[in-house]
Amino acid sequence: MRLLMITIILAPPMAGLILGHAKPQTQATQSGEAKRFLGTWRLVSIVSNSQMSPVFGPNPVGMIYYDGTGHMAVQIMPDGSRPKFAGSAPTPEEAKLALTGYIAYFGTFTVDEKARTVTHHREGSLTPGMIGIDLVRRYEFDPSDRLILTPVEAPAGHLTWERLL
């Protein structure tokens, strides 16, 4: 009897997955400027108030990905000069230091060509308080096809990304 109840409860959702009737992923309309975002980008620099950002050091590293289904992910961290853990597991202080300045989140994105902004709709983040909070960035593509993102709330700073793929 218990097996029959489990089968009745699970059968409809599983059938949808097996037969391809499950809810499709959100498809973004990628036209015009939005298509220029698609691909893999490497962080070139972070400038804050016309100076290199001290939080990330002189040579921060990072990647950002935009795909044709409207999904994106980003990771940014300080340069490689951070100390390694003394043991196999970090001490509380080592763990805190490892997370300092590390940014990682994923979600979907939308492009507003008229406003020349891209919005990252965060669905997951290393920083729990940032989940569900949108990030709006003004964008421009320079003549060498680098992507420059400027936070709307801090227009004196910007991130420059170089296309890899």
Where are these regions (language model features)?
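Lipid interaction determinants
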Residues: 10-11, 16-165
